[in-house]
Amino acid sequence: MAGNNQPWPATTLSPVHINDIFNCQGPSFSFEFFPPKTGEASEKLFKTIKELESCRPSFVSITYGAGGSTRQLTHDLVVRIKNTTSLTPIPHLTCVCHSGSEISGILTRYANAGVENILALRGDPPRDQPEHDHSKDAFQYAGKLVKAIKQFNNAGTHPAPKGFGIGVAGFPEGHPSTPNRIKELD
């Protein structure tokens, strides 16, 4: 897909790895969706997704509620988009409030569904836990989650030869909880 004469990969039902998306020439754009909590809202959102499909975004990302509060809803929306549209869904996956085995289980479910990419994030604690103790999470930071996804890929657990494409996000101005930007880079 990279190296084609299109500004971004053609959106098809064939796998599109996030690296291919960002290695293409020209502009790229995406849409981000938050999974609704009711069936009626889900159908309304999916109708909108089908209408936006004709815009041919490079990918669509699906958020993951604070502390994984929308874990199942996110998974269901990602799989529905994957199976019924030509769009490339990229689910957010956060490490807050998750054990290592939970993360492994989530990755396995996405791999088995044919999902090619993950957006690895630290995430926010649930609203009712503003003082959440991150030391109790299996991965305190997204960098550790990225390592776990790479280990998952290296174990050959994903059916695709490349495994998951991994996207990350950052704070250009520095993470609010980091008192020293130089230390943050380490």
Language-model features: locations:
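An N-terminal assembly and electron-transfer interface module characteristic of large anaerobic redox
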Residues: 2, 7, 72, 111-113
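Positively charged, amphipathic and often flexible ligand-engagement surfaces
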Residues: 2-5, 10-11, 53, 67, ...
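An N-cap/entry alpha-helix motif that binds or orients negatively charged groups
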Residues: 2-42
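Glycine-rich, positively charged N-terminal anion/phosphate-binding segment
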Residues: 10-19, 42-51, 55, 68-87
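Alpha/beta enzyme core
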Residues: 24-28, 37-60, 84, 100, ...
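Short glycine-rich or small-residue beta-strand-to-loop segments that form or flank ligand, phosphate
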Residues: 30-35, 60-65, 90-94
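Conserved beta-strand edge residues that scaffold enzyme active sites
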Residues: 66, 96, 124-125
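Metabolite-binding pocket within alpha/beta catalytic cores that recognizes anionic/polar moieties
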Residues: 71-107, 116
